[in-house]
Every structure is written in C-alpha cells, then in structure tokens.
C-alpha cells in the first residue's frame, strides 16, 4: 500500500522520466493547480513547456469543520502540464496509474467528456473527467484559451485529485483515515487527520464565522488597483499575484455570504478582466524577449502575428 506521500513521490518520479521539470507549489492561496504560473501563464505563447508539481488548493466554501469524510476547504492536486500536448498523452496518463500499482485490466477506468471552464481566469478547454471504479480521480484538459487568448500550441493538462486517488488506493472511506506516512521503529502511522484535521476545523470557522467582510472588500479593491498599476509598468508577474490575491479574497467573501447573486457576477467579471489583461501583458513580455524558449519558426510566426495586430 502506498502512503499519501509515496503517491506524490511515485508521480514525481514517473513524470520526471517523461522530461517534466518538477516544480514547487505556488506560494499563494489558489483555488486549483491551474492558477500556478507554470500552467496559467506558461500555456500562453509558442514556447514549449513540460512541468509537474503538487499544488495545495483552497476553496473556502467547501469547508465542513472537519466533519465531512471527503469534502475539504484545503486539499492537494498533482498537476502535469505538457505543451504542446503530445499525441500519446492518454497512454502517458495510464502509465502513471500503472506506476501507482493499478491493474488496468482489473479496474473500471472511464473517460467522461467534461469540457472545462474557469470564468474568473477567462480560460476554457476541451476535457474529460477520469472515473476510476465510479470515483472521479483526474481531470484532463486541452486548453483552448487562457485569459481570453487562443492557445497555440495547445497545452495538455492532467490534474490528479490526490486525496481521492489515495482513498481509492488505500481503500478508506474517510479522508482523515488516509495513511500520510508509515511509522518506523514501532512508531504509529501518521494519518492525514493528524496533519490536517485541526486546520479544517479552524479554517472553516474563519471562512464562515470570523472573516471580516469590510476588510475583505477593502482588500479586494486594493489588489485590483495594484494589479492595474503594475501592468502599466509592464510587470506581468507581480500583477498576476495581485489577481490571485483578489480572487482568493473574493472566495472568502463568497464563503462568508457577503456577496449577493448579482454582485457575484460583477466581481467575477472584474477578476476576469484583470486575468485577461495580465495574460496579454505576460504574452507581450515574452514577445519582447523574442520567445527565447521557442523554436525559431514558431517564435517568428507569433511575433509576426502580434506585430500585425498591433499595427491594425
């Protein structure tokens, strides 16, 4: 039986062998691995990119005070980004399941069409959910647009839900019963609940009861203003961090019930406008560098298109 941390190590070793850079999590609150710059921004432009990383993900509304056996406000995804998306991406994914010890002949693996969209990031793609014996464990996406910009070449994204995958592999019904790491020399195993249960209880209390809506509204406006200011200085990466801060602040306000249905759409639109502007700013920043990681023919083609668009 693989422990939670061994599942991560196995996936890292597997994707390392496929030529992926093993990156570290983005060090800010994000709702999904897609928000990491290694996916959202690197999907833009003609430069090839292969990376894999664990991303802690926060969704304040999903908190259940540690009482729900499979719903968390803080959880982990394992993200793989392949650009351009290889023709054998499905085989590569199935190979990763075999590396984890799955017998593909003995398990019911289904690909259910499920196109993906993230309105706040202005991103969408063609995709599939992967169901393993009736439980969704992975999302496949071929990015079509990011920040409202068409993706050329297409980026392939594989997102593993680590807790769900581990629950199936370990045969447990409650996420807190997962073995995080094995005890040695007679020490007891460390459980997922030992590491994270208190955090779920306390963060749920903060998200639903103790966050300060007035402070959060002020913070949202400040992050929005700073993002716009940074883009005026052509600082796409710091601006993107402000967008992520604004997005998480919105999620906290949403969890607190401080935003009405009509206001919700307005706030999502404000974040989307920022994300689109940052995406364009980042693409321009790579263009100013001449897309140094791209094959010359690809770089020249996109540079010519951008120049034509600027002259129009």
Curated annotation (Swiss-Prot):
**Looking at the Swiss-Prot or TrEMBL record, what is one Pfam family this protein matches?**
tRNA-synt_2e
Which Gene3D superfamilies does the record cross-reference, listed alphabetically? Answer: Bira Bifunctional Protein, Domain 2, Class II aaRS and biotin synthetases, domain 2
Q: What is its EC number?
A: 6.1.1.14
The GO molecular function terms of this record are: ATP binding; glycine-tRNA ligase activity
Q: Does the keyword Transit peptide apply?
A: no
Q: Which PROSITE patterns match?
A: AA_TRNA_LIGASE_II_GLYAB
One biological process term in Gene Ontology: glycyl-tRNA aminoacylation
Alphabetized CDD domains for the sequence: GlyRS_alpha_core
Cite the entry's keywords alphabetically.
Aminoacyl-tRNA synthetase, ATP-binding, Cytoplasm, Ligase, Nucleotide-binding, Protein biosynthesis
Coiled coil regions in record: none
The reaction(s) annotated as catalysed by this protein in its Swiss-Prot or TrEMBL entry are:
tRNA(Gly) + glycine + ATP = glycyl-tRNA(Gly) + AMP + diphosphate
Compartment(s): Cytoplasm
Output the superkingdom of the source species.
Bacteria
A GO CC term attached to the entry: cytosol
What InterPro entries does the record point to? Answer: aa-tRNA-synth_II/BPL/LPL (IPR045864), Gly-tRNA-synth_heterodimer (IPR006194), Gly-tRNA_ligase_asu (IPR002310)
According to its UniProt record, which protein family does this protein belong to? Belongs to the class-II aminoacyl-tRNA synthetase family.
Q: How does it assemble?
A: Tetramer of two alpha and two beta subunits.
**Name of this protein:** Glycine--tRNA ligase alpha subunit
């Amino acid at each position: 039986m693989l422990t939670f941390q061994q599942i991560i190590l196995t996936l890292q070793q597997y994707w390392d062998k496929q030529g992926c850079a093993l990156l570290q999590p983005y060090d800010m609150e994000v709702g999904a691995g897609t928000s990491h710059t290694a996916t959202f921004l690197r999907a833009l432009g003609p430069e090839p990119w292969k990376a894999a990383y664990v991303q802690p993900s926060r969704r304040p509304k999903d908190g259940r005070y540690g009482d729900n056996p499979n719903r968390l406000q803080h959880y982990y995804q394992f993200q793989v980004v392949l650009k351009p998306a290889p023709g054998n991406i499905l085989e590569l994914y199935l190979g990763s399941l075999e590396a984890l010890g799955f017998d593909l002949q003995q398990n019911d693996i289904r690909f259910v069409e499920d196109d993906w969209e993230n309105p706040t990031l202005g991103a969408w793609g063609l995709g599939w959910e992967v169901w393993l014996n009736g439980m969704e464990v992975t999302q496949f996406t071929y990015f079509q647009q990011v920040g409202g910009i068409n993706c050329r070449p297409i980026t392939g994204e594989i997102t593993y839900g680590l807790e769900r995958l581990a629950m199936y592999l370990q045969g447990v019904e409650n996420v807190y019963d997962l073995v995080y790491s094995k005890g040695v020399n007679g020490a007891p195993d460390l459980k997922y609940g030992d590491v994270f249960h208190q955090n779920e209880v306390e963060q749920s209390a903060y998200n639903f009861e103790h966050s300060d809506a007035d402070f959060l509204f002020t913070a949202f406006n400040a992050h929005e203003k700073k993002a716009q200011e940074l883009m005026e200085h052509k600082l796409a990466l710091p601006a993107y961090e402000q967008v992520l801060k604004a997005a998480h602040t919105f999620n906290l306000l949403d969890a607190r019930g401080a935003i009405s249905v009509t206001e919700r759409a307005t706030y999502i639109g404000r974040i989307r406008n920022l994300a689109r502007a940052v995406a364009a700013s980042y693409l321009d920043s790579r263009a100013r560098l001449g897309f140094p990681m791209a094959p010359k023919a690809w770089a020249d083609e996109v540079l010519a298109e951008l120049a034509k668009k600027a002259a129009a």
